[in-house]
């Protein structure tokens, strides 16, 4: 078991997760991208806006007290919102999906439940990612499908695969 990436759900924590996951693969691990990128018809945020947009997303997470939510349905909606926003920002050149999923998994643990992303297939995840550009609740069904019922997690661990 690796040492967990601790944080308060901030841009820095997301960058640290990315660095941890990809430091042995990419020289740009943990660094915000400086290139304009797209996938298919989806154009992600331009590099000069990434930092401020990430700050806005994480500020909203904290100012609206999303981390204090106790209603499971609202928790899932918050997770979907954060996941959708981070997806369209796409802060890294590569590895956005894995880094974002790990941050969302950590947030779920904060809420008191566990997510197992292997419960949904790649196509389901990609379809939700495409829809999330126009619907910040696009990941709700994916997150629901990934909840491990009856397992309450109190420790965050991050293992490289």
Q: What is the predicted function of each stretch?
A:
Residues 1-161:
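FIC/Doc superfamily catalytic core
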């Amino acid at each position: 078991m690796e040492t967990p990436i601790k944080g308060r759900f901030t841009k820095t924590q997301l960058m640290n997760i990315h660095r941890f996951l990809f430091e042995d693969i990419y020289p740009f691990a943990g660094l915000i991208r400086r290139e304009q990128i797209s996938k298919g018809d989806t154009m992600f945020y331009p590099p000069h806006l990434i930092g401020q947009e990430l700050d806005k997303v994480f500020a909203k997470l904290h100012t609206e007290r999303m981390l204090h939510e106790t209603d499971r349905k609202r928790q899932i909606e918050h997770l979907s919102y954060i996941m959708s926003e981070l997806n369209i920002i796409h802060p890294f050149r590569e590895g956005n999906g894995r880094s974002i999923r790990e941050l969302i998994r950590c947030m779920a643990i904060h809420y008191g439940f566990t997510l197992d992303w292997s419960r949904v297939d790649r196509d389901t995840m990609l379809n939700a990612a495409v829809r999330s550009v126009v619907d910040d609740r696009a990941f709700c069904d994916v997150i629901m499908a990934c909840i491990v019922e009856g397992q309450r997690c109190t420790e965050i661990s991050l293992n490289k695969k």
